UniProtKB/Swiss-Prot annotation:
GO terms for cellular component: cytoplasm. The lineage of its organism: Eukaryota, Viridiplantae, Streptophyta, Embryophyta, Tracheophyta. Disulfide bonds: none annotated. Keywords: ATP-binding, Kinase, Magnesium, Metal-binding, Nucleotide-binding, Transferase. Its EC number is 2.7.1.134, 2.7.1.159. This is Inositol-tetrakisphosphate 1-kinase 1. Binds 2 magnesium ions per subunit. Mg(2+) 2 binds at D318, N320. Belongs to the ITPK1 family. Its cofactor is Mg(2+). Transmembrane segments: none annotated. GO terms for biological process: inositol trisphosphate metabolic process. It holds the Pfam family Ins134_P3_kin_N.
Length: 354
């Protein structure tokens, strides 16, 4: 299994983002796969149905330039026209949450099994609800010599904010609690979170939502990106730890548009090596492989934290489909290699007659 690291572009990135590449299995070389495309005598056509914001962040000039060199052509899909009248496509990339579009894509998959859809709409739906999002991690019950992977204890609140304090007490959850919107629909609002320190502030929250026990983790979060058979780990600052003083002197709700907005105060902080140390590679390899299989997805990331004071206990706190790969160092080469590997696998199946 090939494992290598990329050097940071500058000293600041070296502190803020510590990338690490881990193929889950030995991938084909880009040159070998590009040769398959050449032998097939055709371009690889990738149709995409993405929001304008996603197009801007993902289809960056460097990615498009590299794609052209590898005979990969990205084509925008017109949602107002029948999908069957467009293309033909070899691969379809999508991240639209409209239910009508999801059904169109499901119908297209049945009619055109030769087209690779990234990813199946029915598999993506699993990540649109935070009640079910982490269930596969919990069911995995991953524990080995390298560590233990858990999920925070959580509670779903559908309505009636006034009932939240009693529901929390009945469930036995320990404050502080992180509140997240129940539904993940791709909007910025669905990534907002709130931190509640005391029971009396819970009724100020806005259901439907998920309440998760806050786990002190040294203010460091590990973003683990999955692209097919490869994963990349990026270390980032997160919400700071909560202490007794915080619990005794904060009685409101602290709201953050997203975790990254809560990290500004930690940008210049010195990072304790024991806190910043990346999770063990074998543990991430196992977790990435199992989640890929259980979720039925090839493009996702998950947020992972290490419990402060517990070197071998980790928590997965969120999973996202088709995340912001544009923020991942070196994503262009990783993604192009992934697309080419899909072609090679398809070509091998044709040769074998399967």
């Amino acid at each position: 299994m090939r494992v290598h690291e990329e050097a940071s572009e500058d000293k600041e990135r070296e502190v803020e983002e510590a990338p690490d590449l881990m193929p889950l299995s030995p991938p084909p070389t880009a040159a070998a796969t590009a040769a398959v495309v050449a032998v097939a005598g055709q371009r690889l056509v990738v149709g995409y149905a993405l929001t304008k914001k996603k197009v801007k962040s993902f289809l960056q000039p460097k990615l498009l330039s590299l794609a052209r060199k590898k005979s990969i052509h990205f084509v925008s899909i017109d949602e107002t026209r029948p999908l069957s009248e467009q293309g033909p496509f070899d691969i379809i990339l999508h991240k639209l949450t409209d239910k009508e579009w999801q059904q169109v894509l499901e119908d297209y998959r049945e009619e055109h099994p030769e087209v690779t859809v990234l990813d199946p709409p029915n598999a993506i739906q699993h990540l649109h609800n935070r009640q079910s999002m982490l269930q596969e991690v919990a069911d995995l019950n991953l524990s080995n010599a390298y560590g233990e992977v858990c999920t925070p204890r959580q509670l779903v609140i559908m309505k009636d904010p006034l009932s939240i304090p009693s529901a929390v007490a009945k469930a036995g959850l320990t404050l502080p609690l992180v509140a997240k919107p129940l539904v993940v629909d791709g909007t910025s609002k669905s990534h907002e979170l709130s931190l509640a320190y005391v029971e009396t502030s819970l009724s100020m929250l806005d259901p439907p939502l998920v309440l998760q026990e806050f786990v002190n983790h040294g203010g460091i979060l590990f973003k683990v990106y999955v692209v097919g058979e490869t994963i990349r780990v990026v270390r980032r600052f997160s919400l700071p730890d909560v202490n007794i003083y915080d619990l005794e002197n904060n009685d409101g709700i602290f709201r953050f548009p997203r975790v990254s907005c809560a990290t500004n105060t930690a940008e210049d902080a010195e990072v304790d090596p024991s806190i910043a140390e990346l999770p063990p590679k074998p543990l991430l390899e196992k977790l990435g492989r199992e989640l890929r299989r259980r979720l039925g997805l090839r493009l996702f990331n998950f947020d992972m934290i290490r419990e402060h004071g517990r070197k071998d206990r980790y928590y997965v706190i969120d999973i996202n489909y088709f995340p912001g790969y544009g923020k991942m160092p070196g994503y262009e080469h990783i993604f192009i290699d992934f697309l080419l590997s899909l072609v090679q696998n398809k070509y091998k199946r044709r040769l074998s007659g399967s």
